[in-house]
């Protein structure tokens, strides 16, 4: 098995030369992976801003097709309203259409897709069929189960200003009230411990095998997600720049 690129704790794009190198590269197709709570949303925003590439998630694609009333959206709506999962082939068709848009020429960031091995294999085949196309770089953000539990179950938000706190990691100044509004903080229904464990079981059953699929590639990056968000971002950018320079 090919050893993945690992980004050590504290890894940063420490010099102006390194910063210039990642700014100048063409990022190509990127995949961001990780369990619920690892911070994919935060990192996705940073990557989009740094490289000017679109963020593509299946949730956004489904909403877009439903709002536009497309045939794919109608099929997906019918299935979801019946409590059924949207099949891989339907999701793949939505992704294929999105990747044809001109804003993906320099690259794009996939988030939440592929979620199954079948989707990963379809994506591999599609990318392999593109003449002179850049290969996919897969980035896996790693956070311990215990830390994820604290991040998710400790999360509280202000219903007035939507400011987010964490009772373990970033508590409010006063007990369970917003620092700005003075409003009592609330916990989302899907942030309770029982729901967290169920989400992690689903992730382990469906998505963890996708991580292992890409781990066998020489273009797999593993990042310590327990570092400060800025250091995680710096590690991702440096690793992608290094791998693209070797392509």
Can you describe what each PLM-predicted range is?
Residues 1-247:
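Glycine-rich phosphate-binding loop of ATP-dependent small-molecule kinases
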């Amino acid at each position: 098995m090919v050893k993945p690129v690992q980004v050590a704790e504290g890894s940063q794009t420490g010099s102006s030369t390194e910063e210039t190198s990642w700014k100048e590269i063409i990022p190509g197709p990127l995949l961001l992976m990780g369990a619920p709570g690892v911070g994919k949303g935060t990192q996705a925003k940073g990557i989009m801003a740094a490289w000017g590439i679109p963020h593509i998630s299946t949730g956004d694609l489904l909403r877009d097709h439903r709002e536009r009333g497309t045939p794919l959206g109608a099929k997906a709506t019918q299935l979801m309203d019946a409590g059924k999962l949207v099949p891989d082939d339907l999701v793949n068709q939505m992704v294929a259409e999105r990747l044809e848009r001109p804003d993906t020429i320099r690259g794009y960031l996939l988030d939440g897709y592929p979620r199954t091995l079948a989707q990963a294999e379809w994506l591999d085949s599609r990318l392999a069929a593109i003449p002179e196309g850049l290969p996919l770089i897969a980035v896996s953000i790693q956070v311990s189960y215990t830390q994820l539990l604290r991040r998710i179950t400790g999360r509280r938000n202000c219903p007035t200003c939507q400011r987010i706190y964490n009772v373990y990691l970033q508590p409010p100044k006063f007990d369970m009230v917003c620092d700005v509004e003075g409003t009592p903080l609330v916990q989302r229904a899907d942030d309770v411990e029982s729901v967290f464990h169920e989400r992690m079981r689903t992730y382990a059953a469906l998505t963890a095998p996708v991580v292992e699929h890409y781990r066998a590639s020489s273009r797999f990056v593993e990042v310590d997600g327990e570092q400060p968000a800025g250091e995680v971002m710096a590690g991702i950018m440096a690793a992608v720049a290094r791998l693209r320079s070797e392509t």
